[in-house]
């Protein structure tokens, strides 16, 4: 295609675009940009030649410095050229085939390039939505939104409108400028520091300055004063930019935020005066400096607006978070006297306040403390005496039926009771007659043992004879293979065994 149509940079407007988008430029050449707009408006093939040159510079270019300069030229031309150029720009082939391809993920462009392209598409879609022959960009914009592409937030009311003004640099005889009134020039330059501020929005980069009056020229002294004042503006822009870089939205200090807002108001007032001078000063060098300062102001204003949006959004999130925390704490309502309903403010109070709050809780009559206090209190000493008395009486009743063969066991039991009494020590017995009852019981057992005599040898022989006769009447049984015959149990021993079992059952 290039072979048939020739080099896009060979045309007059193509040469200007090649120079204006050269990557070696330190900043935008606004004089050259406005000259490109004039050529497009005045020549028949200007719009087509300009689009060919811009496509060549944008298509597949990985030098994003040149891409940003080309996008600035494109934006300037759209705002300063007519319908013929708009038709070329809003065509679907250019928007989808060139601009959208620049921000594709495979090219991995910088964020500033992505934001610039998306902002241009969004602004053009909004401006040309009502024009039937310029809706190609509108369709691309809607498709990108359906795909989930997030466009940067932009205050469309604060941006300059897309229109085609008259020629920005009128053709005036240079000799006419020499006859300009000195009073008019002095009043023009004094506007930078003495004019009152008005609430007019700032213009976007590349926006056309309004025509306020006729062109004026200034002497070296006035230019020096103007440049010194521009240095002050640059200093304010630098301070504001550094503050925006250092500050975090939602975490800024009150004094820093107040200073930043003051700088924003001051810089906006200065920009209004700069925009007024851009259209009236005929010195190209001064005009270029004014345009550069205006562009810096626009950039820092965009950063400030983004900072404010993030700050307000963060503060709104924090407010919603606090409200939701309070709501969650009060979900369970246990009544006005419930200790579970504690607000977040009470959690950080001093321990004394917490103690006073706990002390003021209303405890009902059915609580555990009231129930325990209502129980009858007994002396532990009385409880032990009652237990000892019960054990003593039951033991005395059981001992009445027990017989002993060995009189020495009597002394052992008495000594054991004495030891038990010594171990109990300082616990007094409620009734002093208990020990007397035990002694009486032991004396009765002793008398019973004395009356009971052992088995005599005659009785034992008689018992053996009876057993032998009984054994003769019983049929013979096979004797066990080993072991001795069982010994007959003595009736006295059987009695002792039965008494021991009774004692165990009683215990």
Swiss-Prot record:
* Family annotation (SMART domains): VHS
A Pfam family in this protein? VHS
Q: Name one GO biological process term.
A: protein transport
Does the entry feature the keyword Transmembrane, yes or no?
Answer: no
Query: In the record, what terms sit under GO molecular function?
Result: clathrin binding; phosphatidylinositol binding; ubiquitin binding
GO CC terms, sorted: endosome; membrane
- So what family is this one in? Belongs to the TOM1 family.
Description of how the protein assembles with itself and partners: Interacts with clathrin. Interacts with MYO6.
Please give the name of this protein: TOM1-like protein 2
Say which species the protein is native to: Xenopus laevis (African clawed frog)
